[in-house]
Amino acid sequence: MSHNDTIVAQATPPGRGGVGILRISGLKAREVAEAVLGKLPKPRYADYLPFKDADGTALDQGIALWFPGPNSFTGEDVLELQGHGGPVILDLLLKRILTLPGLRIARPGEFSERAFLNDKLDLAQAEAIADLIDASSEQAARSALNSLQGAFSARVNHLVEALTHLRIYVEAAIDFPDEEIDFLSDGKIEAQLNGVIADLDAVRAEARQGSLLREGMKVVIAGRPNAGKSSLLNALAGREAAIVTDIAGTTRDVLREHIHIDGMPLHIIDTAGLRDASDEVERIGIERAWQEIEQADRVLFMVDGTTTDAVDPAEIWPDFIARLPAKLPITVVRNKADITGETLGISEVNGHSLVRLSARTGEGVDVLRNHLKQSMGFDTNMEGGFLARRRHLQALAEAAEHLQQGKSQLLGAWAGELLAEELRLAQQALSEITGEFTSDDLLGRIFSSFCIGK
């Protein structure tokens, strides 16, 4: 498909609504206006007009908005038709537009892609549009808007500019080795490099917060039957999300709840009790439980405090601990403190966190909530923060690695050429975030995840 085509798509969600919007972008948007409206509306003014079929009969009437390029969202001529939100009406209007030569349905994200290709947005800003639409909390929405307005891009561009100046300095030292001053060893380049590394570390810390805000944390509740896993899910969710009975093995399948802790998304997963399965259905449920455990960010190892006094997970259930993925964080949750009389709270046991609570009464659950937030390093004071995706974190990590390699080359052998190459690679990694250096394949993957009309 060519970027020279004129594209059209519904910009409002499918289904019935008060208003339905069709968006057209491209060279033939002007022809669409003249064919459907009978005239070209005044630029950037709302014009109330009938939307006409090919034979001149009215299909609908509504607001027409005309944005001649390059002063539009996509940088091209853009026409928006805002009519009534009935699916039949919108479908009739869409079919009418597609009878005109040179028009086609837009691919998902193609409007935003054209805005990027026409330098109306950089790649991080374009991604922020999708993140703003998908935001699941007020804090995520505010951070996505900050990214859309360029907060993240400005931080990245500042780093790129600093690296450009540093590269110029290093290249000068390489090209003029006979100067009286040895630029590589006089400490100035090292000081500048340390400054860039410190700035990059600060951006990475904020990006990790932004990624948490966007991606959330996947927490799996696991343990033996009747340990109180479903009761804990209900306590964290604040509602009766799971059936709770005294019958062991009540939960047969995976249950999922999406909550927020001070703005941080938390994906809680309740699983079937782990034991030797009594039938095929239970076996499948236990198998799914292990699949979820292997993909978790953290496991809450639920222990019935009335059955054991042990607190070390390796002592409580060594076979379970041995099967867990290496380096998977575990929080031991000793439940039923209302029965055992244990002191509520959190402590450390052999490198693992231990929380004592009562899922039935809710006592101690707030301690667990705070622990989950702190274990991910989530900061609730993110004024001016931005959202970040995993690819952003990877690019920032790659840039940091190249800068550390460059520093080693500088301090170890005063190797200017190798330092210059590491600086170039770091700059290239950062440029992938904003799209200044990005493969077509990556662009395709990013924009294909967008809504059709965006």
Swiss-Prot record:
> Could you describe the subunit structure of this protein?
Homodimer. Heterotetramer of two MnmE and two MnmG subunits.
Name of the gene? mnmE
Q: What is the lineage of its organism?
A: Bacteria, Pseudomonadati, Pseudomonadota, Gammaproteobacteria, Enterobacterales
Species of provenance: Citrobacter koseri (strain ATCC BAA-895 / CDC 4225-83 / SGSC4696)
Which residue windows are coiled coil? none
Keywords noted in UniProt: Cytoplasm, GTP-binding, Hydrolase, Magnesium, Metal-binding, Nucleotide-binding, Potassium, tRNA processing
Q: Which co-factors does it depend on?
A: K(+)
NCBIfam families attached here? mnmE_trmE_thdF, PRK05291.1-3, small_GTP
Entry-linked InterPro entries:
G_TrmE (IPR031168), GTP-bd (IPR006073), GTP-bd_TrmE_N (IPR018948), GTPase_MnmE (IPR004520), MnmE_dom2 (IPR027368), MnmE_helical (IPR025867), P-loop_NTPase (IPR027417), Small_GTP-bd (IPR005225)
Cite the TrmE-type G domain residue spans from the record.
216-377
Q: Which Pfam families match?
A: MMR_HSR1, MnmE_helical, TrmE_N
Give the protein's biological function: Exhibits a very high intrinsic GTPase hydrolysis rate. Involved in the addition of a carboxymethylaminomethyl (cmnm) group at the wobble position (U34) of certain tRNAs, forming tRNA-cmnm(5)s(2)U34.
- In which residues is GTP bound? 226-231, 245-251, 270-273, 335-338, 358-360
Q: Which GO terms describe its molecular function?
A: GTP binding; GTPase activity; metal ion binding
Binding sites annotated in the UniProt record for (6S)-5-formyl-5,6,7,8-tetrahydrofolate: 23, 80, 120, 454
Question: Where is it localised?
Answer: Cytoplasm
Name the predominant localization. cytoplasm
> What is one process in the GO biological process aspect for this record?
tRNA methylation
Record bears the keyword Hydrolase: yes
Cofactor: how and how many bound: Binds 1 potassium ion per subunit.
What family, per the record? Belongs to the TRAFAC class TrmE-Era-EngA-EngB-Septin-like GTPase superfamily. TrmE GTPase family.
Q: Where does Mg(2+) bind?
A: 230, 251
EC id: 3.6.-.-
Q: What is this protein called?
A: tRNA modification GTPase MnmE
Gene Ontology CC terms, in alphabetical order: cytosol
What is the top EC class of this enzyme, as a single word? hydrolase
